[in-house]
């Protein structure tokens, strides 16, 4: 509502008239009346039942895992309509002295997305026709990135043949680094990330959206693609991950995430964000 306050708020009417020195209107004097204007009605996509359930689930999750905060969003991948969205701490509308609770962190705060980025990585190479889900690669136990190396949490100390499907199912960090560096290649990887509009604002109709911090290809060093492949060396708001996942489920088409679906009784058309993958 704050985002749309300008159109929700009407304007007061006023009367301007000619008066004498004492403020008494002059009979037959000049006068001008401006009628009050009502605000514009809007319709939002929020489903109150889903919203309440989302708030309950995230509050329980944060308490269970003793997290600093948590966020959740439910949206339609084909339209971008948002049915539920919240971040902790949840706002207490009976006491809004702490306005920070009104912040939607999944829009306004950046973080390292981690393993969820692997969906983007595998999608980039698949879209380029470099592999199928069943293509097999020999993945080392440790994959060297600069002066460091990455390995999986399973304690594996030997190279293993993995299909791309297996890599994603088992969330293998060395496998993703290998795909980005040696199969896709850093330049094509950077181009694919850009096509997903990672590091660009989504255009969501909520105040405070940040673009995050994403290196361009010119800023890559020898480790950037490998780390980004599994969601490190990049900081973006959660809404960008949501939009990217939605594109994968929407035949590669990016949508604009939004709450507003109608204004003054007329449907609002939101622009497409372009084609991330085919």
Model-identified regions with their sequence ranges:
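Extracytoplasmic/periplasmic proteins that interact with beta-lactams or build/remodel peptidoglycan
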Residues: 1-71, 91-94, 100, 264-274
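Beta-lactam-recognizing serine transpeptidase/beta-lactamase-like catalytic domain environment
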Residues: 20-33, 76-114, 120-278
């Amino acid at each position: 509502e704050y985002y749309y306050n300008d159109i929700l708020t009407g304007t007061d009417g006023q009367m301007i008239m000619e008066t004498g020195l004492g403020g008494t209107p002059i009979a037959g004097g000049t006068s001008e009346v401006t009628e009050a204007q009502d605000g514009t009605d809007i319709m939002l996509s929020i489903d109150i039942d889903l919203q309440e359930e989302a708030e309950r689930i995230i509050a329980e999750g944060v308490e269970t895992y003793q997290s600093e905060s948590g966020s959740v969003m439910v949206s339609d991948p084909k339209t971008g309509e948002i049915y539920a969205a919240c971040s902790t701490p949840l706002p207490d509308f009976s006491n809004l002295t702490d306005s920070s609770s009104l912040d939607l962190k999944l829009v306004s705060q950046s973080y390292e997305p981690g393993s969820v980025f692997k969906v983007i990585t595998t999608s980039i190479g698949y879209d380029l026709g470099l592999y199928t889900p069943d293509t097999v690669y020999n993945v080392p136990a440790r994959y060297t990135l600069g002066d460091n190396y990455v390995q999986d949490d399973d304690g594996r100390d030997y190279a293993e043949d993995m299909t791309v499907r297996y890599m994603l199912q088992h969330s293998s960090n060395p496998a993703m680094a290998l795909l980005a560096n040696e199969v896709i290649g850093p330049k094509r990887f950077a181009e694919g990330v850009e096509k997903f509009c990672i590091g660009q604002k989504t255009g969501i109709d909520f105040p405070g959206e940040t673009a995050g911090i994403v290196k361009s290809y010119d800023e890559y060093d020898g480790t950037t693609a490998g780390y980004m492949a599994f969601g490190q060396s990049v900081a973006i708001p959660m809404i960008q991950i949501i939009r990217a996942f939605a594109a994968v489920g929407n035949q590669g088409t990016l949508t604009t995430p939004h709450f507003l679906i109608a204004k003054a009784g007329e449907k609002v058309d939101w622009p497409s964000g372009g084609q991330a993958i085919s």
